[in-house]
A protein has these predicted regions:
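Conserved N-terminal entry element of GNAT/NAT acetyltransferase domains
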Residues: 1-12, 148
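Acetyl-CoA-dependent GNAT
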Residues: 8-14, 18-81, 92-94, 98
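Short hydrophobic/aromatic beta-strand or adjacent loop that forms the aromatic wall/cage
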Residues: 46, 139-143
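Short, well-ordered beta-strand micro-motif
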Residues: 50-52, 143-147
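Conserved glycine-rich acetyl-CoA-binding loop
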Residues: 56, 79-93, 102, 110-118, ...
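Conserved beta-strand-loop-alpha-helix junction that forms the acyl-donor binding cleft
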Residues: 107-117, 133-138
């Protein structure tokens, strides 16, 4: 799968990112940021990429640099219409390759998001812990990590 483009997000991308996040918000398996102002703040704290297919933003991927050896993958969101097509796998492949020198990559995932958990496990992530109310939304999260 090479027909997707990863582009560093800019403020003009925020409405399209929010549209995808709003589609995902009702799933109950993710923490979606559905306000444009929250996304602009997130872009100041994280490195955010948009996922583009056929000229359309279909998702986003974000990470925070904790240190030169530690990255926190703060989000990987794919529009439900484009899920189960290998796009998440392609994005994760590119990021893991790009972050080759990083010793530790952390991710959080909702326990009901079995597709994401399976994907991360296939990439060598391990389940480290369970956190109740992780984002303050009343929902638990699983913390997964990959040490390279």
């Amino acid at each position: 799968m090479t027909d997707i483009i990863l582009k560093k997000a800019d403020p003009e991308d925020v409405p399209a990112i929010v549209a995808v996040e709003r589609k995902m918000a009702g799933s109950g398996t993710c923490y979606a940021i559905t306000a444009e102002e929250e996304w602009k703040k997130e872009m100041g704290n994280s490195v955010v990429y948009v996922i583009i297919k056929d000229g359309k933003i279909i998702g986003d991927a974000a990470f925070e640099v904790k240190s030169k050896d530690h990255i926190y993958g703060s989000g990987l969101m794919i529009d439900p219409e484009y899920q189960n097509q290998g796009i998440g796998r392609e994005v994760l492949t590119r990021f893991v390759k790009e972050l080759k020198g990083v010793k530790r990559i952390d991710m959080t995932v909702h326990p009901h998001n079995s597709a994401a958990i399976g994907l991360y496990l296939r990439f060598g992530f391990v389940i480290e812990s369970w956190k109740d109310n992780y984002y303050g939304d009343g929902q638990p999260r699983i913390i997964m990590a990959k040490c390279q």
